[in-house]
Amino acid sequence: MTKAYNIIHHKFDVVVVGAGGAGLRSAFGMAKEGLNTACITKLFPTRSHTVAAQGGISAALGNMGEDDWRWHMYDTVKGSDWLGDQDAIEYMCKNAPDAILELEHYGVPFSRTEEGKIYQRPFGGMTTEYGKGKAAQRTCAAADRTGHAILHTLYQQSLKHKVQFFVEYFAIDLLMEDGECRGVVAWNLDDGSLHCFRAHNVVLATGGYGRAYFSATSAHTCTGDGGGMAIRAGLPLQDMEFVQFHPTGIYSAGCLITEGARGEGGYLVNANGERFMERYAPAAKDLASRDVVSRAMTIEIREGRGVGEHKDHVFLHLNHLSPEILHSRLPGISETAKIFAGVDVTKEPIPVLPTVHYNMGGIPTNYHGQVIIKDGKNHNSVVKGLMAIGEAACVSVHGANRLGSNSLLDLVVFGRSSALKAAELIKPASPHRSIKEESLEKIINRFDKVRHANGNILVAELRLKMQRTMQSHASVFRTQEVLDEGAGMISEIRSGYKDIKINDKSLIWNSDLVEALELDNLLDQALVTVYSAAARKESRGAHAREDYPDRNDEDWMKHTLSSIDEAGKVVLDYKPVTLTTLTDEVTAVPPVKRVY
């Protein structure tokens, strides 16, 4: 089958798949260390989803009041509901201040205080004095367009350091041999050619799989391509049951209203005009962690206190804030609310509803970004030649629930750490090991089979079934009955993939084929998500079980590892959470009941 296609071969020291914040930070970091670096991306780098991040990036700089990275670590462990690995969390929080100063040095135009320091705003779950003090102003912001500012800056650095970009190339599958990754195969959408990239190290920085759901703040490109490739390579994914619902997606549109809006003083109200978060989180109120706020909103709506004709959403008030603050600190939000909700935020509230926002789960890695698997008693056996970073990965610093503004931090800290590790492991221009023809043949055969699929189901039709099922059966609140039904439905939908129909057989800009390949990635991740959720009989972080309302540390303080066998069945395994720190500079945070 390989002879039927024009396959172009490349050799690089490292290949990064994805050009968002994590991918770019990793790519130019590796190029800076002298490694011949390629970056494959299915869309132009500055259109990557990092560009949509609004509120900010967390670091204990102490510009707006006393702060300490140890307090940041405590908040992150608590936010994770004690499913986060404390060695990785320590690494991230300790390196956060330097990461911000590095970004500033690269040219990120952060907002400023009157003294000229980087402006920091409060964000949900961020506190001082190990949760005993007031809210911490820890989130560094570039107005409400922080991701945009960071992504453009990182792209400039990548060009400066001569990263070689392959733009609008769709990554199909990993080249795996003897349990090692030797490269990746991609399809050039512009001319239809297939490309075999050989590399000593492949970095998956492909983002999350938010588009497995019907309503998500994610771009339509967020199809979890790295996770799909990992599953097909026989690797497990970790903690896939933990899907974050952001409290404030615009009602009916799903577009994000940043948590920074509440950080600047915005608040939620129900149909009675009551600031209901005071009942659910008396101390943190509207700035409790995202899972807590999303559940509170869902309960208010369920109990008949929603607003609007159908009483199916709540209001976010910003109209008490001065127009000057809205213009200087939340300019993008004012514009988004006007376009997608028809609301003038200076005069009226924004209709909002919890919306799928982030995947805490992903490809398991250590804090160097190296992909790890369970091998006998060794839970951290490294997969040679493969790394994963950003939302595609599960380090796990976010555990069962991510704190707002920790995701941009995750991207730059672990993007940098992956580059440092690669430079340590790889000698520039060292020879590549040979690959077997059948390894490439297998990848091309799968691609060709999808391209010539001539069944009865349209890709868009099958995708919509999956999205609606995930939205209704793996949502904010879950029960065994609903999850089991959802697992059966997603299994059936996934089996329908072999009956899809591709109308366009061409190789140049074939969006029908792109969407089919993306759907394959989404279906595998949807499947392991719902099966992992059905198996976890407790409530922890974003995984809220109505039939098991309490956290159960004795039985369930462990990471889920999920894979799919050749028969299409989900196989679940578990490994312990790391409850020890990396150094003696900080003590581990013991599990307690999580209250805000």
UniProtKB/Swiss-Prot annotation:
* Localization terms from the record: Cell inner membrane
**Pathway, per record:** Carbohydrate metabolism; tricarboxylic acid cycle; fumarate from succinate (bacterial route): step 1/1
Q: Please report the record's description of how this protein sits within the membrane.
A: Peripheral membrane protein
A molecular function (GO) held by this record is: succinate dehydrogenase (quinone) activity
EC no. given is: 1.3.5.1
Which superkingdom, per the lineage? Bacteria
- Does the keyword field hold Oxidoreductase? yes
Q: Where does substrate bind?
A: H246, T258, H357, R402
The active site consists of R290 (proton acceptor)
Keywords, comma-separated and alphabetical: Cell inner membrane, Cell membrane, Electron transport, FAD, Flavoprotein, Membrane, Oxidoreductase, Transport, Tricarboxylic acid cycle
Q: Which GO terms describe its biological process?
A: electron transport chain; tricarboxylic acid cycle
Please name the Gene3D superfamilies in this protein's record.
FAD/NAD(P)-binding domain, Fumarate reductase/succinate dehydrogenase flavoprotein-like, C-terminal domain, succinate dehydrogenase protein domain, Succinate dehydrogenase/fumarate reductase flavoprotein, catalytic domain
Checking Pfam families in the record gives: FAD_binding_2 (PF00890), Succ_DH_flav_C (PF02910)
Cofactor(s) the record lists: FAD
The chemistry this enzyme catalyses reads: a quinone + succinate = fumarate + a quinol
Q: Name one GO cellular component term.
A: plasma membrane
Q: Mark the residues carrying the PTM Tele-8alpha-FAD histidine.
A: H49
Residues recorded as binding FAD, renumbered to this chain, are: 18-23, 41-56, 225, 391, 407-408
Q: Does the keyword Transmembrane helix apply?
A: no
Assembly information from the UniProt record: Part of an enzyme complex containing four subunits: a flavoprotein, an iron-sulfur, cytochrome b-556, and a hydrophobic anchor protein.
NCBIfam families for this protein: sdhA_forward (TIGR01816), sdhA_frdA_Gneg (TIGR01812)
Q: What is this protein called?
A: Succinate dehydrogenase flavoprotein subunit
Lineage from the top down?
Answer: Bacteria, Pseudomonadati, Pseudomonadota, Alphaproteobacteria, Rickettsiales
The gene name on file is sdhA
